[in-house]
């Protein structure tokens, strides 16, 4: 998607329109986030399912995502891809943290990586910076 945005940014008047993109990791508790799944599994007394314990994901709070958009409005130039530095965490550490918050004794069940999933999440590659 960023390539489309950057390409479009090159075709419009820089004086009148700024087209940029913000890129996030995983926004906690948003649609598609694994955290609500972990919470439901804990509340239902089921094992907490983890695809691959060492798989990493970049996590950010909703407030951080909103701050990134506001920062982009104030500072971006056309064609920019705005990325906030955010720490990566393993899925196992995230599952343990949710278990800890709920004082859960639920076991963690490793279910294996799914087709097409990446072991390590990267928000910005060297190629994207070029």
Question: Model-flagged regions — what are they?
Answer:
Residues 1-76, 87, 91-101:
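NAD(P)-dependent short-chain dehydrogenase/reductase
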């Amino acid at each position: 998607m960023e390539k489309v945005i950057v390409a479009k940014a090159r075709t419009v008047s820089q004086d009148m329109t700024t087209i940029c993109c913000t890129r996030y990791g995983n926004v906690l508790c948003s649609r598609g986030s694994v955290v609500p799944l972990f919470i439901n599994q804990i509340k239902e007394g089921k094992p907490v399912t983890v695809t691959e314990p060492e798989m990493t994901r970049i996590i950010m709070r909703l407030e951080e995502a909103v701050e990134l958009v506001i920062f982009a409005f104030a500072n971006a130039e056309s064609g920019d891809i705005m990325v906030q530095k955010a720490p990566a965490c393993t899925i196992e550490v995230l599952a343990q943290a949710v278990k800890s918050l709920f004082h859960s004794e639920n076991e963690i069940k490793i279910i294996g990586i799914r087709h097409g999933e990446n072991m390590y999440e990267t928000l910005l590659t060297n190629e994207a910076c070029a």
